[in-house]
Amino acid sequence: YKSTFRLPTFNDLYYYRLGNRNLRPEKADEYNVGITWSKSGLSVFDYISVTLDGYYNDVTDKIVAFPTTYAWKMANYGKVHAAGVDATLAATVPLTEKIRLIMSGGYTWQKAIDLTDSDAKNYKDQLPYTPLHSGNASAIVETPWVNVGYSAVGVGKRYYLSQNIPENEIEGYLEHTMSLSHEFALGGCRLLLQAEIINLTDEQYDVIKYYPMPGRSWRLTGTFKF
């Protein structure tokens, strides 16, 4: 358990169009319980780790960026209850003497509801841009020649305004990324080259309403390590 207190930042108060000089400090009572299990040297796994956390937050005057018709604005939600569960899994599997598979994944369930005004139409509705379900997964095959990676990020439906009605709904999405990488020795330093295909399936989605994210794209990066 912990009790927290957060003052509005300078940008929260004064940023052009977004800021709100009337913001009140945010206060919260936070409760959390979690377990972690890990093991090395198993017959299948070199290493495996599992975590599970549950939490409940009772928040007064929660500071949020609130979407309006033409611009975003910082505002206080008078009373918010947030409950959630976070789960993660990480594992390393040796495939051969020189090749291994590294896997990881995470899932979040979060219910964050507005309890400010019991007479309001959005009473007990999920906060804007807060998905109930979200998760990620990744896998990398490491070899002496090249590393092959895959990752996916998924987000469930959200609402871009306070009322949880179909007109305000933003569809969920699942984005995939593939990568190839290899590290070279160059004298006293090392060069890591990586090629990626981002949004492999060319998924059309919005993170923010009316601002579509890019489709399929390619990226090549190089990193020197001295």
Where are these regions (language model features)?
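Short, glycine/charged-rich beta-strand-loop motifs at protein surfaces that mediate ligand recognition
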Residues: 41, 53, 163-170, 177-181
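Outer-membrane beta-barrel "beta-signal"
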Residues: 32-36, 88, 214-226
